[in-house]
Swiss-Prot record:
Belongs to the MCM family. ADP binds at S515, Q516. This is DNA replication licensing factor mcm2. PANTHER family: DNA REPLICATION LICENSING FACTOR MCM FAMILY MEMBER, DNA REPLICATION LICENSING FACTOR MCM2. Acts as a component of the MCM2-7 complex (MCM complex) which is the replicative helicase essential for 'once per cell cycle' DNA replication initiation and elongation in eukaryotic cells. Core component of CDC45-MCM-GINS (CMG) helicase, the molecular machine that unwinds template DNA during replication, and around which the replisome is built.
Length: 886
């Protein structure tokens, strides 16, 4: 028996060798078949002589060979087990048996290969002709790799030469696939970083510790080591990734031989693909190629089981057919039963069928990247295996995958002609956050930002840079600037989350640029979603569940607050929302999450965003004789969730109105499209004067400054004056109870802390100092006093004058007091004479008395200041009058 098996191997292996040599470029490729080679090695005269004098098989003695011999006509009893019952093998037993047979055949082929090389080729000649092969064999031997298929490694010397084939055809060839397989396997084994550490040994170890099946591979590393593979990969990703997965699985099993019990497959995930395509730029030339795109997840299905390797039962004979490997494009079904030759029916064998996880998501272009007037495009993506649940609605992700097309009958019905739907088969997903944006800053940008932060008046410069095309409204600009920088979120012990975002509500008369402020923030913020209260429902703001029109499954769709995660959500016409819709954002504004429990989907989505809303008062105009809560149609729970309330009144002030008109006309002249004086529109914008009296920052610099500060600066509260905040809170509570205006709650303490952190972050400070606390108290007080009745507003300003005077020079305070005196005089003249005169006179003594109340005793500097003259005031020393001419 042993002899017969040896003769069988010797007879069959040359045929296998000749078949394998046909694929190789080895020196023996053009030689005749193996049988002919071995005959020619015994000399020219021997073979013809054997052919002539050979034994004649057909003759008279032919029947003697068929005579009965009792000893040889019986089978040997040893080794036979016919009497035992033979059971059917299970799938796992069969796989183990086939694995052992493959290993045995591999071992025998290896021994046979060594014999054949020694028989056919001279060793010296081989070393001269094939030095590369010997070097590669030595490297593999040093790595301890098995020597199987050594001939096949040399099948293609020049992988770049595709011999006129396309990349997909070239990669599909057996010899090319084997060369790619070995090159990638060698890359995984030997790639090291700049410190000499083995990169993938650590990655594989981490992957196996977490029982995962995804091995991330940096495309840039692959291109540096194996540029040919990096060239083939985007052109034929499906074929290349299949080879990569097989090579990665073998490398993993060498390190962890039994890991296939945990993960049946190992998937190579390609990251850092250099070219990023926009969703709206995907065309037919990208079909079946590896692409990288980004967007916001707007919709995702549940995790479904997808058939991976399916087996069928024949209902007539109960024979098990399969396994059939299912592809993404079509369903593979058996045609007929090989046992009973029937054509069905067949049903899926649930026990032996292998499934894999399947999830479908929809990604949409990020809100900040869509051009004005364009609708955001969206695209479906399929997540398989351990990629499922790696993202949820509202997450901004970078997606690397294969751009596929598939047949969609509903599209053909709708369009009337055959078209294909497109989908991205995901390979790698990365969640984007602010760190990615900061990575876009250059070293020069960082140096310029740090240098700017050392300017003593950087706070005023940033306030002046907010909406430079809008005149005045310093309190709104200050509040929006603090909201853009934001405070620091806290989550002590991972149990109770305290938000760090600052919410702002603008309320006031029509025509006071409320919507313009929102539009400006939309352009400056790195991620902003703009919506209106009239056009936004409760589910449009939060999230909703709907049934997919084609698949009929429930999907989770994200609303505006979820899409604005880690950004800004801008809501115009906030008062036009009905109460039911408005209450839906209570949780989003304070807990910064949205809980969903609909149609069997129970989940919680992140809504970590700043809410900036604008509303109009009841009746159209703000009535200063009423409190804030009486002027707006908003409930106390929603008002208390706003940190800063900005009340904008359209008061008649001839001097201010004239300055505003001059500013608007100047702005229109400088920003006209056909203006020849200034080529750059941004330069014209910054040339406009501002009421802060400092130079504003360019808008691009401001964006980078905010981006850097939000990501890199984490201000702490170690050195904060706690007593001052506590005293301020108790005073505000007392005044609130006395006046009956907006209620002061514990949320306002947190608001002051958030504003102090935002002011510290604005100056790139790591700790909150006293100046930050004073600015937070000033903004809080201005917000609180503006919401009072006009009758109590003046007394409250006098009560909190020392807090309101922070960061204001004496000239500003005196100008404010003088304007109040002028307004009183104008009211007196109208009531007495029925009309306002062109000249208003105020006794100097009245201004001196008011100035002493705020501890200002010397007014000469104020009389000489530009601020005094700019507002058309003159000082008559002889008459001791202050005169304003209109």
């Amino acid at each position: 028996m042993a002899d017969s098996s040896e003769s069988f191997n010797i007879a069959t292996s040359p045929r296998a060798g000749s078949r394998r040599d046909a694929l190789t470029s080895s020196p023996g490729r053009d030689l005749p078949p193996f049988e002919d080679e071995s005959e020619g090695m015994f000399g020219d005269g021997v073979v013809p002589e054997e052919e002539e004098d050979g034994e004649e098989l057909i003759g008279d003695a032919m029947e003697r060979d068929y005579r009965p011999i009792s000893e040889l006509d019986r089978y040997e009893v040893e080794g036979l087990d016919d009497e035992e019952d033979v059971e059917d093998l299970t799938a796992s037993q069969r796989e183990a048996a086939e694995q052992s047979m493959r290993m045995r055949d591999r071992e025998m082929g290896r021994e046979l290969g060594r014999m054949r090389r020694g028989l056919l080729y001279d060793s010296d000649e081989e070393e001269e002709d094939r030095p590369a092969r010997k070097r590669r064999m030595a490297e593999r031997a040093a790595e301890g790799a098995p020597e199987e298929d050594e001939e096949m490694i040399e099948s293609i010397e020049n992988l770049e030469d595709m011999k006129g084939h396309t990349v997909r055809e070239w990669v599909s060839m057996a010899a090319t696939r084997l060369e790619i397989y070995h090159r990638f396997k060698n890359f995984l084994r030997t790639h090291v970083d700049e410190h000499g550490h083995n990169v993938f040994k650590e990655k594989i170890s981490d992957m196996c510790k977490e029982n995962k099946e995804s091995l991330p591979v940096n495309y840039e590393d692959l291109a540096a080591r194996e540029h040919v593979l990096a060239y083939f990969l985007p052109e034929a990703p499906a074929e290349m990734l299949k080879i990569f997965d097989e090579a990665a699985k073998e490398v993993v099993l060498v390190m962890y031989p039994k890991y296939d019990r945990i993960a049946r497959e190992i998937h190579v995930r390609i990251s850092h693909l250099p070219l990023v395509e926009e969703l709206r730029s995907l065309r037919q030339l990208h079909l079946n190629q590896l692409i990288r795109t980004s967007g916001v997840v707007t919709c995702c299905t549940g995790v479904l089981p997808q058939l991976s390797m399916v087996k069928y039962n024949c209902n007539k004979c109960n024979f098990i057919l399969g396994p059939f490997f299912q592809s993404q494009n079509q369903e593979v079904r058996p045609g007929s039963c090989p046992e009973c030759q029937s054509f069905g029916p067949f049903e899926i064998n649930m026990e032996e069928t292998v499934y894999q996880n399947y999830q479908r998501i929809t990604i949409q272009e990020s809100p900040g990247k869509v051009a004005a007037g364009r609708l955001p495009r969206s695209k479906d993506a399929i997540l398989l295996a351990d990629l499922v649940d790696s993202c949820k609605p509202g997450d901004e992700i970078e997606l690397t995958g294969i751009y596929h097309n598939n047949y969609d009958g509903s599209l053909n019905t709708a369009n009337g002609f055959p078209v294909f739907a497109t989908v991205i088969l995901a390979n790698h997903i990365t969640k984007k956050d602010d760190k990615v944006a900061v990575g876009e800053l250059t070293d020069e940008d960082v140096k310029a930002i740090v240098a700017l932060s050392k300017d003593e008046r950087i706070g005023e410069r940033i306030f002046a840079s907010i909406a430079p095309s809008i005149y005045g409204h310093e309190d709104i600009k200050r509040g929006l600037a603090l909201a853009l920088f934001g405070g620091e979120a806290k989550n002590p012990g991972g149990k109770h989350k305290v938000r760090g975002d600052i919410n702002v509500l603008l309320c006031g008369d029509p025509g006071t640029a409320k919507s313009q402020f929102l539009k400006y923030v939309e352009k400056v913020a790195s991620r902003a979603v703009f919506t209106t209260g009239q056009g936004a429902s409760a589910v449009g703001l939060t999230a909703y569940v709907q049934r997919h029109p084609v698949t009929k499954e429930w999907t989770l769709e994200a609303g505006a607050l979820v899409l604005a995660d880690r950004g800004v959500c801008l809501i115009d016409e906030f008062d036009k929302m009905n109460d039911q819709d408005r209450t839906s954002i209570h949780e989003a504004m304070e807990q910064q999450s949205i809980s969903i429990s609909k149609a069997g989907i129970v989940t919680s989505l992140q809504a970590r965003c700043t809410v900036i809303a604008a509303s109009n008062p009841i009746g159209g105009r703000y009535d200063p004789s009423l409190t804030f809560s009486e002027n707006v149609d908003l409930t106390e729970p929603i008002v208390s969730r706003f940190d800063i309330l900005c009340v904008v009144r359209d008061t008649v002030d001839p001097v201010q109105d004239e300055m505003l008109a001059r500013f608007v006309v100047s702005s229109h002249i400088k920003h006209h499209p056909s203006s020849k004086d200034i080529a750059n529109g941004d330069a014209a914008e910054f040339a406009l004067p501002n009421t802060f009296g400092v130079e504003a920052l360019p808008q691009e610099v401001l964006k980078k400054y905010i981006m850097y500060a939000k990501e890199k600066i984490r201000p702490k509260l170690n050195q904060m004056d706690q007593d001052k905040v506590a005293k301020m809170y108790s005073d505000l509570r007392k005044e609130s109870m006395a006046t009956g205006s907006i209620p002061i709650t514990v949320r306002h303490i947190e608001s002051m802390i958030r504003m102090a952190e935002a002011h510290a972050r604005m100056h790139l400070r790591d700790y909150v100092v006293e100046d930050d606390v004073n600015m937070a108290i000033r903004v809080m007080l201005e917000s609180f006093i503006d919401t009072q009745k006009f009758s109590v507003m003046r007394s409250m300003r006098k009560t909190f004058a020392r807090y309101l005077a922070f960061r204001r020079d004496n000239n500003e305070l005196l100008l404010f007091v003088l304007k109040q005196l002028i307004a009183e005089q104008v009211t007196y003249q109208r009531n007495r004479y029925g009309a306002q005169q062109d000249t208003i006179e105020v006794p100097e003594k009245d201004l001196v008395d008011k100035a002493r109340q705020i501890n200002i005793h010397n007014l000469s500097a104020f009389y000489d200041s530009d601020l005094f003259k700019m507002n058309k005031f003159t000082h008559d020393v002889k008459k001791k009058l202050i005169i304003q001419q209109f």
